[in-house]
């Protein structure tokens, strides 16, 4: 599982001209589900995302997590994160979970986030999405499990 997290001032996602998810200050997640991912992987990643300290405290040190600042989370499924880019000039998606399995795992991941934090907004699995964001920093991390 790979999750690219970005600290944002605000972010939104549009599908077919309609805004379907938006947050103010918080985290934008791009989530790639791989063949080897399990429920345990999802639980560990959800906990890590919510506890990851990327927001500044009063001394300017990245010492606060999204829950501590009352921020939002916008989660976007992105199978291209599971690409193998080691060889050639075209990515291979052999490590990505098959679509039906990936959707079930992604939905479970979102539900784990929702059980622990609010607000959680999402895009639409496998849709052509337009994601807008205002990076804060920029602060971006790739989390892998």
From Swiss-Prot:
Which GO CC terms are listed, alphabetically?
cytoplasm
Q: Which reaction does it catalyse?
A: glycyl-tRNA(Ala) + H2O = tRNA(Ala) + glycine + H(+); a D-aminoacyl-tRNA + H2O = a tRNA + a D-alpha-amino acid + H(+)
GO MF annotation list: D-tyrosyl-tRNA(Tyr) deacylase activity; Gly-tRNA(Ala) deacylase activity; Ser(Gly)-tRNA(Ala) hydrolase activity; tRNA binding
Q: What is its EC number?
A: 3.1.1.96
Where's it found, cell-wise? Cytoplasm
At which positions is motif Gly-cisPro motif, important for rejection of L-amino acids? 137-138
The superkingdom listed in its UniProt entry is Bacteria
Q: List the disulfide bonds.
A: none
Q: Which family does it belong to?
A: Belongs to the DTD family.
Q: How does it assemble?
A: Homodimer.
HAMAP family in the record, alphabetically?
Deacylase_Dtd
Q: What is this protein called?
A: D-aminoacyl-tRNA deacylase
The record lists the organism as Saccharophagus degradans (strain 2-40 / ATCC 43961 / DSM 17024)
């Amino acid at each position: 599982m790979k999750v690219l997290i970005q600290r944002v001032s605000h972010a939104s996602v549009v599908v077919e001209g309609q805004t379907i998810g938006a947050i103010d200050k918080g985290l934008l997640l791009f989530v790639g589900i791989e063949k080897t991912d399990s429920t345990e992987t999802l639980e560990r990643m959800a906990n890590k995302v919510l506890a990851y300290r990327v927001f500044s405290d009063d001394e300017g040190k990245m010492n606060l997590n999204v829950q501590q600042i009352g921020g939002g989370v916008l989660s976007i499924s992105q199978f291209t994160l599971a690409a193998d880019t080691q060889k050639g000039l075209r990515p291979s998606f052999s490590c990505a979970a098959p679509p039906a399995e990936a959707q079930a795992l992604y939905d479970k991941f979102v539900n784990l986030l929702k059980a622990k934090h609010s607000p959680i907004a999402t895009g639409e699995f496998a849709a052509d999405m337009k994601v807008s964001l205002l990076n804060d920093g920029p602060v971006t991390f790739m989390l892998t499990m």
